[in-house]
A protein has these predicted regions:
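Core dinuclear metal-dependent hydrolase active-site scaffold
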Residues: 12-18, 34-35, 130-160
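Active-site-proximal loop/helix segment associated with metal-binding centers of metalloenzymes
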Residues: 12-33, 40, 114-122, 174-175, ...
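Short catalytic-loop micro-motif centered on adjacent basic/acidic residues
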Residues: 43-47, 142-144
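Hydrophobic residues in well-ordered beta-strands that form the structural core
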Residues: 47, 103-107, 167, 207
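Short beta->alpha connector loops
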Residues: 49-53, 146-148
Length: 232
């Protein structure tokens, strides 16, 4: 049973603006972190909690929510912590210092996350595509969308109001994730985009970076305006 619309807790945080304000890399990378939960039970999960996990835990606590897990869209350091461009980024390893919670990852991404984020498999909960995670009475479907990385995944939040798709670096409002990085695969990306093209039009897309003036858009608009769907 999905949480009713008034129970859904959903917050979008922009790195360098809403947290990590003094972090120049956080400002440059414009990552989005999401908090998704059930207001009635007070449980929530964080999607891609990088840069300042403690601040994110505090932010949701101020809303009366407690973190019961984290979701990793993929292994890159700007999403889950690690080293990038010669900088060390806090992430899921530091989150575990503040909240001893499971980190939900796609099974194919486990070895990449272990290497990049410094978190052992004992803290990682591996999932297959189609798995459904319950947060209170809210349900989140985990969708394997390889291409940017082998175990990239998107999160479909079931909501009577129409649903939300948190897409990490698989799909942006304009464009898609790069396919020229370690573990990337252009053919898999095309297959993943075809899969996401089947997401209902009324679902709202929430990407992993603010690469467009808007922070989100209905899938109908994304399908109509994003050039990546011209080849679908």
């Amino acid at each position: 049973m999905s949480a009713h619309g008034d129970r859904l807790y959903f917050r979008q945080f922009l790195s360098g603006r809403d947290f990590g304000v003094a972090d120049q890399l956080a400002q440059q990378m414009v990552n989005f972190v999401y908090a998704i939960g059930d207001r009635q039970t007070g449980e929530c999960v964080l999607v891609d909690p990088a840069y300042d996990p403690a601040a994110l835990v505090d932010a949701v606590a101020a809303d009366g929510m407690r973190v019961v897990g984290a979701l990793a869209s993929h292994y890159h350091a700007d999403h889950i912590g690690g080293s990038i461009f010669g900088h060390d980024i806090a992430g899921i390893a530091q989150l575990l210092e503040h909240a001893d919670v499971p980190i939900h990852v796609q099974a194919d991404e486990v070895p990449w996350i272990e290497r990049s984020a410094g978190v052992g498999s004992g803290h990682l909960m591996a999932h297959a595509s189609g798995d459904v995670l319950a947060v209170g009475e809210l349900t989140i479907e985990l969708i394997h969308t390889p291409g940017h990385t082998p175990g990239s995944q998107c999160f479909l939040v079931h909501d009577p109001a129409g649903g939300k798709l948190v897409s990490g670096d698989t799909l942006f409002l304009d464009g898609c994730g790069r396919t020229d990085l370690p573990g990337s695969d252009p053919a898999q990306m095309l297959a993943s985009l075809r899969r996401l093209h089947r997401v209902p039009d009324e679902v709202v897309l929430y990407p992993g970076h603010r690469y467009s003036p808007a922070d989100s858009a209905p899938m109908a608009a994304v399908k109509a305006n994003n050039w990546v769907f011209d080849q679908i």
